[in-house]
Design a protein with these regions (language model features):
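Glycine-enriched loop-and-adjacent helix/strand subsegments that border the catalytic/binding cleft
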Residues: 1-90
Length: 90
């Protein structure tokens, strides 16, 4: 289990730089980026990237606008600790 932050953007023009793209972030939400770690080494060794080792990710049912994060959202980065518990165990 990997806790990550996902963003939903408006239209992103090709070739835009980091500073220009920051203003296109519309929503922020949590995502569980699942990895089947025992499959990754053999898949990467084949040179084609992830196929079976990266199944579908799970997104939070709620998204917020960046301004709702207040001081925790600075320079398009969330400045908060994300903790993952599995069945109550960190």
């Amino acid at each position: 289990m990997e806790a990550e932050i996902a963003v939903v953007t408006g239209d992103v023009p090709m070739g835009i730089d980091e500073a220009g793209s920051a203003g296109l972030i519309r929503l922020v939400m949590l995502v569980n980026d699942v990895s089947l770690r025992n499959l990754i080494p053999s898949e990467l060794a084949k040179g084609f990237g992830f196929f079976q080792s990266k199944p579908s990710s799970a997104f939070s049912p709620v998204a917020v606008t960046p301004d709702e994060l207040g001081d925790a959202w600075k320079n398009s980065i969330l400045h908060r600790v994300i903790e993952v518990d599995l069945n109550g165990t960190p």
